[in-house]
Amino acid sequence: MQGMIHLYCGDGKGKTTAAVGLSVRAAGAGKRVLFAQFLKDGSSSELNVLRALQNVEVACREQNFGFFKAMDGQTKAAAQKAYSALLEDVMRKSADGVDLLVLDEAVAACNHGLIEEATLIDFLRRRPETLEVVLTGRDPSQHLLDAADYVTEMRKRKHPFDRGIAARRGVEF
């Protein structure tokens, strides 16, 4: 089966949730899943379930670098090093029998210069023929849009955050 590239983007809620759902579906079908998270510290609730699934490996960096806008130069350099290494690691692992690779928030990591978009695009072009890939994040470049076979845009129409309600564990993270 030819692998496809999925891009879940937009300013609405549900990008990671959709990627998790596809991961569960693939694992349930006996497929091997590698779920990598960028810009998150590994504490999101969905990872507890994914880590418990037999065919799923979770890859993330457990350091919390904070929000990109608040990073000083030293913190940004450390985040860039950590996330570039994460991308290299999952690219290498994906050649070893992985059926589905999720790169959660890879789009945002590219947008902030924490991973090289050219490296990601090159990987997407050279990936194993049967590897299905999911990318998530806001504001993908035209290069990423062009590389994708599926583009699904989640659009925010209304969100509790706009009323000052903070993210809730088990719902938003």
List the predicted regions and their residue ranges.
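Phosphate-binding/switch loop-helix module in NTP-utilizing enzymes
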Residues: A70-E132
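Hydrophobic anchor at the start of a short beta-strand
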Residues: V33, V133, V151
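Hydrophobic/aromatic ligand-binding patch that stacks against planar heteroaromatic rings
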Residues: R25, V49, F123, H143-L144
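Conserved nucleotide-binding/hydrolysis micro-motifs of P-loop NTPases
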Residues: L39-G42, N64-F65, V107-A108, D139-Q142, ...
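Phosphate-binding/switch region of NTP-binding enzymes
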Residues: D139-F173
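Conserved D-loop beta-strand region of ABC ATPase nucleotide-binding domains
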Residues: T136
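Conserved P-loop
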Residues: M4-R92
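Short, glycine/charged-enriched secondary-structure capping and boundary segments
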Residues: L22, N48-R51, G73, I115-T119, ...
